[in-house]
Regions:
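Small-residue-enriched flexible connectors and coil-helix boundary/helix-cap motifs
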Residues: 1-207
């Protein structure tokens, strides 16, 4: 059924390093792979396999800050790590789920920073930080995009994740009724948060 949405964008988030904390911004360039710099970097293990909070929950403590020509990463007990937008090192091949993806290694300093912070005491890990190769075309699963060719970088599935304040409010009402604490929108790692629409109307948007 046709319907009109009078929605406004209330919040914008990017997640420069896959599975690390996001950063809220007032504006961001929309590109064919999603918001600029979203999931542009990723942590991989010694075999080039992607690493996420599913294996290492401490990744959530790594907080980015976007500056003019760099992203700055901070974590408890660590010196800040500065990643220049225009700096990469050798080309590598890495894996995200079933996809083999072209990327660039970000060098030994970044690798040591992530290895030091994310390793458990007595269990050192060899981790590397890589950046997506912009010449590589990684398609979202056509099964989930209804046949539309949607490009993304290191995201799990889609160029953008859209949520709404209405859906969050409805969820928190149900949580409260069940005796649970409310959750914030950050729990769902959206890129775009919409205001002014009913719960779950974002699922009906044909963009």
């Amino acid at each position: 059924t046709d319907f009109d949405l009078q929605a406004t964008i209330s919040r914008l988030f990017v997640y420069p390093v896959k599975s690390c904390a996001g950063v809220e911004l007032n504006e961001m360039l929309l590109t064919e792979t999603g918001l600029e710099f979203d999931r542009a970097w990723m942590v991989v293990d010694a075999n080039g396999e992607f690493v996420t909070q599913r294996q290492i929950p401490r990744m959530a403590l790594i907080k980015p800050q976007m500056k003019h020509m760099e992203v700055v990463l901070r974590a408890p007990g660590m010196l800040a790590l500065h990643l220049a937008f225009d700096r990469v090192e050798k080309p590598v091949r890495v894996r995200v789920w079933k996809d083999e993806v072209a990327a660039y290694d970000m060098g030994d300093i970044a690798a040591q920073w992530f290895s030091d912070f994310l390793s458990e005491p007595g269990k050192p890990q060899t981790l590397r930080l890589v950046r997506f190769d912009p010449e590589h075309r990684r398609l979202s699963s056509l099964k989930w995009t209804d046949g539309v060719e949607a490009l993304n970088q290191f995201a799990d599935g889609y160029p953008l994740l859209v949520a709404s304040e209405g859906s969050l409010a409805e969820l928190n009402e149900r949580l409260a009724a069940a005796g649970h604490e409310a959750v914030g929108i950050e729990r769902f790692r959206p890129n775009i948060v919409l205001a002014g629409i009913e719960a779950h109307d974002e699922d009906r948007v044909d963009a």
